[in-house]
Design a protein with these regions (language model features):
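Acidic (Asp/Glu-rich) sequence patches and key acidic residues
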Residues: 1-184
């Protein structure tokens, strides 16, 4: 259980009789090197790719909830390329702040032992008011930690890496749609 998050890209590949040959798409789906018997390439309309998967990166979930067009309440969001560019910019800004931030130790609930809560020390970033304005942790049932710590930073770094690669791809034609989906 927990917050599972997916960024997907759908590319429109339907062929029309009025399209010139150089604009036609060719789709092949193979399994074990053999054409898949239940998929008719002539009927394929979209190709859907998983751009990124996150696990309990609640600050990213909160960003999508607050900055994109909601399709299903708190679960599915429609995105434009510009949304990904903005998320990338925000992540870079947060990473820059964290690169110069000091750390401190904080006690948090570590779990239960003999029927009682116990506390553990965790290292967190200090003086992170700016980070809280840009990408604050988002609370939710099984959403993960609300600390600005090294795990938070790793989620930001991985998001930057994936979004930079995605946004570096050429814009070809039309028909590319992005969608964010979360479940918990």
């Amino acid at each position: 259980m927990g917050l599972d998050m997916y960024l997907s890209k759908k590319t429109y590949v339907k062929n029309w009789s009025h399209q010139p040959a150089e604009e036609q798409h060719s789709v092949e789906v193979k399994r074990g090197g053999v054409l898949h018997q239940t998929i008719n390439p002539e009927k394929v309309t979209y190709i859907t790719e998983e751009v990124m998967y996150w696990r309990k990166a609640n600050q990213i979930h909160g960003w999508f909830c607050n900055n994109t067009r909601e399709l299903v309440d708190n679960v599915r969001y429609e995105l434009e390329r510009e949304d990904l560019e903005k998320l990338l910019s925000d992540c870079k800004q947060v990473l820059e702040i964290l690169s110069t931030a000091t750390k401190t130790t904080k006690q948090v609930v570590g779990g239960w032992k003999n029927g009682e809560e116990y506390l553990v020390d965790v290292e967190v970033y200090d003086n992170i008011d700016e980070v809280m304005e840009i990408l604050p942790p988002t609370q939710g049932f099984f959403f993960g930690s609300e600390n600005i710590d090294d795990y938070y930073k790793q989620d930001i770094e991985e998001t930057i890496k994936v979004l930079q690669a995605e946004l570096a791809l050429p814009i070809v034609g039309y028909g590319v749609e992005y969608e964010y989906y979360a479940s918990w």
